[in-house]
Amino acid sequence: MKVRASVKRICNNCKIIKRHGVVRVICKEPRHKQRQG
């Protein structure tokens, strides 16, 4: 899980979703998981 100021899609499987006001990237590649911090 990477915590960064600006979350971006890394590959085509990445999806940007908003959960409880937190922007997240979910992907089948675990290294692409991100959260806005």
Curated annotation (Swiss-Prot):
SUPFAM superfamilies: Ribosomal protein L36. It comes from Vesicomyosocius okutanii subsp. Calyptogena okutanii (strain HA). GO terms for biological process: translation. Pfam families: Ribosomal_L36. PANTHER family: 50S RIBOSOMAL PROTEIN L36, CHLOROPLASTIC (PTHR42888), LARGE RIBOSOMAL SUBUNIT PROTEIN BL36C (PTHR42888:SF1). GO terms for cellular component: cytoplasm; ribonucleoprotein complex; ribosome. The lineage of its organism: Bacteria, Pseudomonadati, Pseudomonadota, Gammaproteobacteria, Candidatus Pseudothioglobaceae. This is Large ribosomal subunit protein bL36. The keyword Ribosomal protein applies. Keywords: Ribonucleoprotein, Ribosomal protein.
